[in-house]
Amino acid sequence: MEFQYSSTEIRSLEQIRIYQQGTLVKSVRLAKTDHAYLDAARFYGSDNKEIYSYGFEYNGKRPEGYMSIDYWGYCNGPSTSSPHALYVPNFTLPNNRTIPGLNRSLNEAYMQKGILTKIVYPTKGYTTFTYEPHRGQNGVLYGGLRIKEMNVYNESGNLQEKKWYKYGLNESGNGRAIRTVDPNDYCSQSYLLEAYWAPGFEGAITLLGERTRVDAYHAFPLSDYFQQGSTVVYSCVTEYMGTPAAPEGKTEYRFSDFMDEWYYGTMRGNRTEIPKWSNAWKCGKLVGKTVTDNSGKIVYSLSNTYEEINRRDYLNLRVLSYCNIYGPASGIKEIFSTHTDFSTATEGSLYDYYNYYITSGEYVVKESKEFNDGVYKTVRYKYNELGQIIEETLVNSEGNEQIVRKKYTCDFWKDAMSGSIYDKMYWKNIHSPALEISVYKGEALVGKTTNEYKDWGDFIALQNVKQLNYYEPRIKYQSYDKYGNPTVISKDGEFEEVSYIWGHQGQRVIAEIRGGSFDTLGPVLTDRVTSAVSPSSADMAIIEALRSNPSLEGSRITTYYYDSALNLKQLVMPNGTKTSYEYDSFGRLACVKDQNGKIIESYQYNYKQ
């Protein structure tokens, strides 16, 4: 893929070009306004002709220049007149003097400036969006927008579907604000202590001079006003469909929500910037889903119970500058605690402190209960220390249990010998494959699958798949090429092996033989075909000649030919029958022809110009 940017300082992305083996197969051109608003995404084929496009419309534009912003950074008014405008909010000092800062209050109309309002699809149908501001406790407005309504229209402008959303418990419209606006969040306090030399009886002595309080005001809050990108979170969202006059029903979504835990203050009683414990990692999980029809009847419900696994809490110390010693004798700060005046003035330390925790772990589904079309089922899960499912218990409406137990690399590595395949997989971080899957009805074992891996030299890959009853290989991977593609596979119950030759640098199968092998070709030709960007006509002719090789009588050979974009161009069956595939300039299948050139399948795509 090739990315092309504008030559301006903004370096805005203008075009994406996609190549396959050096040949351009498609491109995307981005039409923008002022490099800030994407007006259209136009898709072109290999012939440089436009195939289809998406269009985007917005609610006007945000003010140009130095934008006025609210407490959360959203636009709240016309541009400021100067780049030197004071972005801190208005503040009143203890002596009732006011610092004339920027108006940081929320403005719903300006906050929606420049927001996406319409998407036009290649079919010329379109979707429109309506927004509203977030609402926290007691209906207080907060920065940021939430979707209020979505309308879907066809190409003729006829309304096809309408969705609208209600937020909060009992559709109150209110959620939980991450943090209320507090002037202290925009101000940090510290002190300056003057230290100077004065003559004494036995030489110069260090004296404490002026003690100055410094209030530093900031354009943005020192604390985070967002969680997962939002200033307000909602534990319940209800989606309606149809029209307000004739709703088709609704879907209620319920999500996990946990407040962060905060200290009351720092060691010196100041407001902390970081929560003692952040619970954001447990928030936003789907707790429940209920679908009702327009009569209020429940047609589907889902209820999830979660648990913490592998939790670790790491204690940290936040250190803030509280006092700085300056002046001719500022070196005193190295040993200030030995000077009573300075120690008293700094209350024993030049810094302020508080603790907080960083938590690791996962919040996973422990039990899921589902009701669908009158049928109930419950699924319970157990996990290992890597968060992988090791046991899944399904209980149906009749109370019957099916248990699936899984074992992974870490389960076998614990008892494995050094240098064994499990030891190699563990240290290469190959942890995701399930190596053993056992199925029980109640406590009776009814099925078992074992996946055996092998170190093939350059990589580790599957060798055998064994199943209960036979407990012999059901699928055996006998060899791979250098790209990790299987070249010989045998299956239990089938008396013939299947061999493959891969081409186009290991990206596509170019030949398949059943009941025989490609050994007569020799490793030199096979490796040359596999490694080539595109197999030569001469090499493909040698492979095709195997069809008449007496030593391969009874075997069945299928060959595959591809175009420069690696789309299947021709399929030659074991009996020699050829099927051809043709594509449009954007690489989509247009038609399928038999060996006589007759179209047997045709495809058309409904995009309006």
Question: PLM features: residue spans?
Answer:
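Non-catalytic interaction/targeting regions
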Residues: 1-520, 527, 552-580, 584-596
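C-terminal tail/sorting-segment detector
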Residues: 592-609
